[in-house]
Amino acid sequence: MFNNLTQRFLKIIKKISNKGRLTEKNIKETLREIRIALLEADVALPVVKNFIPSIQKSVIGNQVNKSLTPGQELIKIVKKELTLILGKENHSLNLSVTPPAIILMIGLQGSGKTTTTAKLGQLIRTKYKKKVIVTSIDIYRLAAIKQLKMLSKQAKISFFPSNNTQSPKDIVQHAIQHAKLKFYDVLLIDTAGRLQIDKKMMNELLDVYNISHPIETFFVADAMFGQDSINVINEFNKYLPVSSFIITKTDSDTRAGIILSIKYLTKKPIKFIGTGEKLEELELFYPDRIASRILGMGDMLSLIENIENKIDKKHIKKFSNTIKKYNTFNFNDMLLHINQIKKIGGVNSILGKLPKTQTIFNSFQNNIDENILLKMKTIINSMTISERHQPELIKGSRKRRISLGSGIPIPEINQLLKQFNNIKKIMKTIKKGGVTKIMQGINNIIKNKF
């Protein structure tokens, strides 16, 4: 979701980097461009009005580090100020209470609240090692109850049943009693999404809040709603205290306004962000890492954590050995790597966390079609065992047979063979330690995608 803003910042940084030093004139011009970039990204005006003077004060008030270029100095200052606006530090869940710890999920209809409830349940089960149960009090939409039941099964967490003949208060009371009897650590309550601020429904929500005494009341906000969500949040806050936020659909091609505005305007932290549709695509929110991502510096820590949590240690060891013996790399290895890439969120998730230069950014500023991986798998699965082990065997007649078997045209099979050879070259470069050449190699693969 930061693509447009990141591109603007990269251009601004490149422009100031060409200057010999920071002067009052080029600082003023740069701040004007940053202001426009933030407003176009739908960042709230009060946030921008605070942000720009803070940068100006830091640039002019601090002695410029002589070892840094103007561009580096600007990045350092802007990253610091962005981190402050985003929340300064990470706020994690505190589940150190007498069980069950109750979490209330509230928000507008269509924000992804039910899916997020299941995602959070799975994250608490896997990361915090807690016994989790979920329930729905959305008696106005039976599909929501069925959806949560199905998702809870996928997330390997328990589901407490409910139906539209019960009142939300009764469901919550019975769910709490059940959670205590069965020694659950955490109870997640998915509430009915609101289309508007309805007094009757808000009072109903307040009753549930007073009965459950939640340790967290998460407002689930859709990133695509933009800063308009702030007004809705303030209305919710009049009835019951919102404690923190989960921002969903941050993988969408939308502006970053809500993420950059919500903490400053509400004084409540963002704790999680939804980065995709899959249950595992919910991440802890780290303000400093998001600031780095916005400035094109990447988020290598999150990428490393993702790899450590989701990729088999045996695969990492095998990949390391493959690099050492890059000449033995074959299509069986490639198929294994494709499956691992899908595990950590796909190509776009990885690229989104890599550091960017303007050149590299231009190569993948538009999302890469994840179906590329599916095509690759289909082609490889249409090869014989000997062809997978010895790709050099794949010539004219074999290509035609693979094309017929996979239903994919020969030019795209040629493209896969070309990419396979590019990957081998990158492995050779990694072994020799050439980082710049590695990035150029990745850049070439991206440019030559299907």
UniProtKB/Swiss-Prot annotation:
Keyword Acetylation: no
Keyword Cytoplasm attached: yes
GO MF: 7S RNA binding; ATP hydrolysis activity; GTP binding; GTPase activity
InterPro entries: AAA+_ATPase (IPR003593), P-loop_NTPase (IPR027417), Signal_recog_part_SRP54_M_sf (IPR036891), Signal_recog_particl_SRP54_hlx (IPR013822), Signal_recog_particle_SRP54_M (IPR004125), SRP (IPR004780), SRP/SRP_N (IPR036225), SRP54 (IPR022941)
Pfam entry (one): SRP_SPB
SMART domains: AAA (SM00382), SRP54 (SM00962), SRP54_N (SM00963)
Localization per Swiss-Prot or TrEMBL: Cytoplasm
GO biological process assignments: SRP-dependent cotranslational protein targeting to membrane
PROSITE patterns according to UniProt: SRP54
Catalysed reaction, written as an equation: GTP + H2O = GDP + phosphate + H(+)
Uppermost EC category: hydrolase
EC number annotated for this UniProt entry: 3.6.5.4
Entry keywords, A to Z: Cytoplasm, GTP-binding, Hydrolase, Nucleotide-binding, Ribonucleoprotein, RNA-binding, Signal recognition particle
Residues that bind GTP: 107-114, 190-194, 248-251
A single cellular component GO annotation: signal recognition particle
Subunit structure, interactors included: Part of the signal recognition particle protein translocation system, which is composed of SRP and FtsY. SRP is a ribonucleoprotein composed of Ffh and a 4.5S RNA molecule.
Family, similarity comment: Belongs to the GTP-binding SRP family. SRP54 subfamily.
Domain notes: Composed of three domains: the N-terminal N domain, which is responsible for interactions with the ribosome, the central G domain, which binds GTP, and the C-terminal M domain, which binds the RNA and the signal sequence of the RNC.
UniProt function note: Involved in targeting and insertion of nascent membrane proteins into the cytoplasmic membrane. Binds to the hydrophobic signal sequence of the ribosome-nascent chain (RNC) as it emerges from the ribosomes. The SRP-RNC complex is then targeted to the cytoplasmic membrane where it interacts with the SRP receptor FtsY. Interaction with FtsY leads to the transfer of the RNC complex to the Sec translocase for insertion into the membrane, the hydrolysis of GTP by both Ffh and FtsY, and the dissociation of the SRP-FtsY complex into the individual components.
Protein name (database record): Signal recognition particle protein
Species the sequence originates in: Buchnera aphidicola subsp. Baizongia pistaciae (strain Bp)
